[in-house]
Amino acid sequence: MLPVYELIMQIVMHDTIEMKILKVVITQKFLGEFLQLFESWYAPEREYLKNILHRLYAKLVPRRKLIRKMVTDTFHSLIHEKVKFHGCAELLDINAAVISGFAVPLREEHVHFFNSVIVALHKVQSAGEYHNELLRCSMLFISKDPSLAVELVKGLLRFWPFANYQKETKFLQELYEVLDVLDASRVQELLPSLFKQIAKCISSPHLQVADQALTFFENDYFLSLIRKYKQIALPILAPVISQLADTHWHKLLQDSMIAVRQILKDIDTPVFESSLKNLQSPGYLILDCETLRKIRNAKETQWSDLTRKAQQRTPGVQLPIPPYNPAVRASDFNGLNNRDIILVD
């Protein structure tokens, strides 16, 4: 197929091809079938397709709106229907070039695209495969309109992965990137969820996730938020970090926890000390494995009841398949004494 794509590229780039001829050929049906080719496993083929589509968008001005709509529909199909789409990274590359050309202030349709596509693409299970391109699009949008950073953080916290440590690390990196441009007038509404997520990541059994979460305490803006909103931050962060500083099994991370604990204590010692005794602290982050097992079993029983009721109400209903099963569940807390570990081949 590559010679065919090369021929199409030459036709599109040829100066003697009249615009009206291209308009007749480049229809909605053509674009729909063309975008389906991005499903190819072969990366060089997808690269050819990307270059052709980019050239078409640049040359065929009357069809730009249609091309954007068809690409958006492809993204929506991935978000709401599919688990994986091999050409997502290439389409995001094209979108990055398009976003760079958006005028400021952004039009309403562009803001809607950011919220319904760019933010929503984070929740796709295979997002790790195109995360670099997605991050580039996100930051380009935010450079055009910094107020969108709040919506991005809300989306990251809402779609935070729970069974994919590589994806979780990338989410932390993106959250770190966007932190400095958050709108100061709207940041307070995000803080409880933000601090809780950081605390969860610090207590993660995966070392890379925990280490990445600790880098937030090297960020001056993040520390300024803790100082300014210490009544919110310390009751959430102090109990978790204090316990891990005493019990974490990894020596280097334990040293980092001790350093962070001292930073939090220096911010306001009385508030820090009272936070360790505060009954409203997020104890679910530091529960023992027996308590966590009981909580998990109660939730699984609840889901089983809901599943049974759904099947009684709608026979033949197709239930979603979770991205994990009990056989691959390794740990519920940070520690080596978990008696619920199951190893399989």
Each language-model region and where it sits:
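Short inter-helical turns and helix N-cap capping residues of alpha-solenoid HEAT/ARM repeat scaffolds
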Residues: 41-42, 84, 127, 163-164, ...
